[in-house]
Amino acid sequence: MEMTSTQRLILANQYKLMGLLDPANAQKYARLETIVKGGFSLELKELDNEFLAISEAECQTVLETLEMYHALQVSYENLADKSDLTAHRLQFIGYDAIRERKYLNYLRFITGIEGKYQEFMRCAPGCDSQTPMWDKYNKMLDMWKACPHQYHLSLVEIQNILNA
């Protein structure tokens, strides 16, 4: 991470203030302040990893995934016979916190800060799937988009999407 002396001073002061405002994490902020003030290149790379970039297309895919899960839930509720499918299978489980952090962060922004999709967000605390889900969700999206009536899915269509 390349920074001018002025930028480093501003960031170091911000870390100092964060340490004062958040005593529980003061040690973490003091470490970060020291790294920035010292200009330690190796550790500055660590800071750069905190700034994730998620493309517009990736954001759209996350939103489409949430919309697909909404459609699955609505369609399930409208089924006359639910005996071959449990509601548990329709639960969105989130993204892997280690390998899919940028998607998980965007998901948390959309559901937490923006307050969208709250009606069906029942994933485990933090929505950490603990296994990569991006490719699975993309396969599911392809199946869902191929359905003629995306919000009036049959039992077979729901199962095909879930099994993609």
UniProtKB/Swiss-Prot annotation:
InterPro entries xref list: UPF0304_YfbU, YfbU_alpha-helical_sf, YfbU_helix-hairpin_sf
Pfam families found in the cross-reference section: YfbU
Similarity-based family: Belongs to the UPF0304 family.
Name of this chain's protein: UPF0304 protein MS2240
Biological source species: Mannheimia succiniciproducens (strain KCTC 0769BP / MBEL55E)
